[in-house]
Amino acid sequence: MEPRAGVSKQDIREQIWDYMESQNLADFPRPVHHRIPNFKGASRAAEHFPRLQAFKMARTIKVNPDAPQKNARFFVLESKKTLLVPTPRLRTGLFNKITPPPGATKDILRKCATSQGVRNYSTPVGLDSKVLVDLVVVGSVAVSEKGWRIGKGEGYADLEYAMMVSMGAVSQGTPVVTIVHDCQVVDIPEALLEDHDLTVDYILTPTRVITTGCERPKPAGIAWSKISCEMLGKMPILRSLRHQEEQAGKDVTLRDGPRSPPGATRSPRDLAPPELGSVPLSSVQIGNLPRDARVSELKRALSALGVAPSRLTWQGPQHGAFLHYRDPAEAQQAIACLQGFRLGANTVRVVLARQQRASDLVGSHTAEPLPDHQPAIAGP
């Protein structure tokens, strides 16, 4: 199956999706349209993965969270290597580190490799973690033997890689692997490729291992001119990276936003915490923290999510905390980012607390009650 002449990326996607469904090559979840398609034989294709020399040499491996890469995630855990999985749509950070329970059996490791396991056994990895990724696995809708790749059209794999470059986690020499059905290996016109498109070095199918020898440069960092204000608003970690690059004097002009002049920085006054007694803060109340949670652990997680507060009031005995932000907009953004947030095995409860003056921070807090059937967090 080869794409017809004069096609677009979307034409190729639709052709692959339609073919996999019509030939019953697709596996759950179906239909595969608008997804990284799962396929019959995905586990067979993944069996090539631990045989790659790049896998044997790697210590830390990033694998996408899609269904056809489930066995690849299992092989990473079974080999006692560090497994990093991107957070869905990058809404709450970039990576989660999957940490199986002590003494985990193969059955438990297989559960850890599922989407549910990724949620239950993960901890956020922040921008300041200095992580080095030795091998990258991405999903694809279509890929060519030359190593040119087409994703599902949302650009997350390209952006994930670019963000890893920006934080120093990968380099041009970091190998990239994709796992696909044989029918997904097609000719892709080079004219369709853009500078921000990620290429691959190895293609694993149920019947073949293809070494692409691709020499086209991989993305050298985030192409800010391709990023919209809307996308930036949904991804706190992207905002953090943009601020870092802005501080370094790089051009971080967005596709649809005003230009930030190179070298522009916030004034010390902008960065300073509010003075006590003068500026009201917006507070977020969180509860259902694990009994053994530590304040340092929570601070690291919040930083990784890009929602570090101006001040944090710890309420360990009540398994909760107050997060104090500079304004209501920051507080609402934090609440949005913390929906479904897990610390350890617990899903954290989040609610907007009654706005307090900064001077209240030296005394006790009186927060609005949590929603019905949720235990309130008492003030100190």
UniProtKB/Swiss-Prot annotation:
InterPro entries reported for this sequence: FTHF_cligase (IPR002698), FTHF_cligase-like_sf (IPR024185), NagB/RpiA_transferase-like (IPR037171), Nucleotide-bd_a/b_plait_sf (IPR012677), RBD_domain_sf (IPR035979), RRM_dom (IPR000504)
Biased composition regions of type Basic and acidic residues, renumbered to the chain: 245-258
Keyword GTP-binding among record annotations: no
GO CC field: cytoplasm
Gene3D superfamilies in UniProt: 3.30.70.330, NagB/RpiA/CoA transferase-like
Alphabetic keyword roster: RNA-binding
Molecular function via GO: RNA binding
Domain annotation RRM: ranges: 282-355
Residue ranges, annotated region (Disordered): 245-283, 361-380
Superkingdom: Eukaryota
Protein name, as recorded: Methenyltetrahydrofolate synthase domain-containing protein
Species annotation: Bos taurus
